[in-house]
Amino acid sequence: MKNRTVLLYMTFVFLSNFSTILYFLTVYLEFVGFSMVAISSMMIACQVSKFILEVPTGYIADRFGRKVSGLVGIVGMLGYYVALLLVRSPLLLIGAFALKGFAVACVSGSIEAIYIDSVSQDQLVRLNVVERFVFYASYAISACVGGFISSAGAYLIGLSADIIAMVLTLVVVVCIPEMRRGDTAATPEHGMSPQMIGAAIAGNDILRSAFIMDCSQAFAFVALEDFFSLLLAGRGMNAVASGVTIAVQLLASASMGLIVPCAIAHVDKGRFARICGIVRLFLTALFLIPLTPVYLLPVFYVLQTVAYSLFAPIKYSVFQNAADSSMRCSLISVQSQMVAVGAILFYLFNAALSSIAGIRVILLVALGIASLVYIPALFRLTSQRT
């Protein structure tokens, strides 16, 4: 049963993250005639919706069923992709992006919590590495395909493929068994409340540090993903080159991430995570500096994601071990909510500075601000022992 759940979950990770439009979304929206103001409004609608609904949907999943929550979210994502394909009204698409935020909130933590409950804690680091590999492989394949699709302007084909992938995701989730938890989790779960979730966070420095890291990291990196293709296009790289760069970057990250179990067996996990986290910030700064030669941009982008893939499984396993099983969905949802907060703050920051600076400079400034919060939280998180 456990092996079947893990296999189905990894399949879910691959299919749910397959999106040919992801790295070329802003390019596509410009292609069909939307202004940058409209595009920014859509992005904000998604993040605000996710921010508002992350905790309520996680709470509902913990109380009434994680699998049902995940299925509702996947159906919502199907609606979002269909809207991207067919809708050309800015207001309706803003609504579709809000639907995406709701869908992501429903999926966030729900299926993952079923998977976490099916494996032992000492397996999490190893399986987290496998999960990251599957995650990056899905992104790499879809990014490479998306680059060719964007270059040819064949977005109908790409969005149709994304819809098919989401339908297959729905089938996989239906097949995932949701085990009824026994005495250790059932009783606390039924008595859980938002106040209990808040108290759990307030009394746990690991959770607080993880949430601060998620928020500050989103402030610096979410928009980097959203505007990645436009950034490279501004430096003279076409969509195919962008897609191939993303694919190489993701596959390199996944491959390097496989060495984490071996590496942490011989080095201090906390120190290893701190070094990788700080190196990632430095490499990202080199990618964003306007004077960096164009031919070095793919190199720095690949290396910064490799650094992240090396320490992410360690950071996440610390968070997973600190999250109480009876409210794990809710805590994972809070984690996702912090990502939404960071993204919203960046888009507001971008709106305030867009008239006096370009997106590359704004991202560089955001990276510097985020580092002031991220680095202390990283040190606090990795100095704890669970």
Predicted segments with their positions:
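Cytoplasmic helix-loop-helix junction between adjacent transmembrane helices
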Residues: 98-136
